[in-house]
């Protein structure tokens, strides 16, 4: 195999994305490998056989010609050049030729952090990391770092202390799931019993009144509509006792009036004495403006990579998202 030249090595931030659902080596002519100029020169830039499950592209050896992207009959390949400034800011990568997240949003106590970005850009991934449900591998998916290395990586930032407290269970995180239509698959029983089982704060009555859940108490969860499931999910998260509250798309299925009431309920969990953290992923910009104290924008290419910006005040963050241009990047 040839050793990549110095000119090629400088493009180390180039990423190759292969969609595992679209890539079908057994049904195509392996065009990605056949037409690759690097492979023709004797370099293993693309490794794939008709018996392979998926094509594997070396990002270090790829020259970014884009021939494989054009030749793939299933449109399963994407080659993307990233700024070199992101080279050492990888927070997590799910595997070779898969989605990559750069940086993390930094929550602040007693404030609502809003996350805004298109679908598939890494918002839910960031939430899972901040909730302690996903261990960030800093881009090293073959030999993931230990927590000591991860904490050292975030040394000097507010995230170091936050992640350390999550690890030590000094902070307890609760997350409202994104896809509320899946709730009946995992939970059974009446609405009242489910809420009572999760009620750890003396706010159940107020939350049910605000979210208009009182008339649903005797219903089974599999009888609820999408909007009713959404309000129930918000309520179950809000009435629980936690240090970090996370709401993933709380406005979906709700009308305008219900969205504003849900926003008021979410802001009600802030506790200045305790130093509560609240993080919200929201696509409704009006609700995001009403709900948040500061905003982080996520940009990139859906399904390929996502980058978290520095925090902005709400107005600037929303304007940056709408303009599609980040002045600080």
Label the predicted regions.
Residues 29-51, 56, 67-84:
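Iron-sulfur cluster-binding cysteine motifs and their immediate structural context
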Residues 91-102, 137-229, 240, 264:
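ABC-family P-loop ATPase nucleotide-binding domains
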Residues 116-118:
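The feature captures the beta-strand-to-loop junction immediately N-terminal to the Walker
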Residues 220, 247-251, 257:
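Walker B catalytic motif
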Residues 234, 262:
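Hydrophobic anchor residue at the start of the ABC signature
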Residues 281-283:
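H-loop/switch region of ABC-family ATPase nucleotide-binding domains
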Residues 290-297:
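Conserved catalytic segment of ABC-fold P-loop ATPases
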Residues 297-329:
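Conserved beta-strand-loop-alpha-helix hinge in the C-terminal portion
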């Amino acid at each position: 195999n040839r050793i990549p030249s110095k000119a090629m090595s400088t493009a180390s931030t180039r990423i190759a994305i292969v969609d595992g659902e679209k890539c079908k080596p057994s049904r195509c002519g392996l065009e990605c490998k056949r037409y690759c100029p690097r492979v023709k020169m004797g370099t293993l830039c693309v490794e794939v056989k008709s018996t392979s499950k998926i094509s594997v592209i070396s990002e270090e050896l790829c020259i970014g010609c884009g021939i494989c992207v054009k030749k793939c009959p299933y449109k399963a390949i994407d080659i993307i050049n990233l700024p070199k400034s992101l080279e050492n800011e990888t927070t997590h990568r799910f595997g070779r030729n898969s989605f990559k997240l750069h940086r993390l949003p930094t929550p602040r106590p007693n404030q609502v952090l809003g996350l805004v970005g298109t679908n598939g850009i890494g918002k839910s991934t960031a939430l899972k990391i901040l909730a302690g449900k996903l261990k960030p591998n800093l881009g090293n998916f073959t030999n993931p770092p230990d927590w000591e290395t991860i904490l050292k990586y975030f040394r000097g930032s507010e995230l170091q202390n936050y992640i350390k407290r999550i690890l030590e269970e000094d902070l307890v995180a609760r997350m409202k799931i994104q896809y509320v239509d899946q709730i009946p698959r995992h939970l059974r029983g009446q609405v009242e019993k489910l809420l009572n089982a999760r009620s750890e704060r003396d706010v159940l009555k107020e939350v049910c009144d605000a979210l208009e859940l009182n008339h649903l108490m005797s219903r089974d969860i599999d009888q609820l509509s999408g909007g009713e499931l959404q309000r129930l999910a918000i309520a179950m998260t809000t009435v629980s006792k936690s240090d970090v509250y996370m709401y993933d798309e709380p406005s979906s299925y709700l009308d305008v009036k219900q969205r504003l009431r849900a926003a008021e309920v979410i802001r009600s969990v802030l506790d200045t004495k305790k130093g509560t953290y609240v993080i919200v992923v929201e696509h409704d910009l009006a609700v995001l403006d009403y709900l948040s104290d500061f905003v982080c924008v996520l940009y990139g290419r859906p399904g390929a990579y996502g980058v978290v910006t520095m925090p902005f005040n709400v107005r600037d963050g929303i304007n940056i998202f709408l303009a599609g241009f980040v002045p600080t990047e």
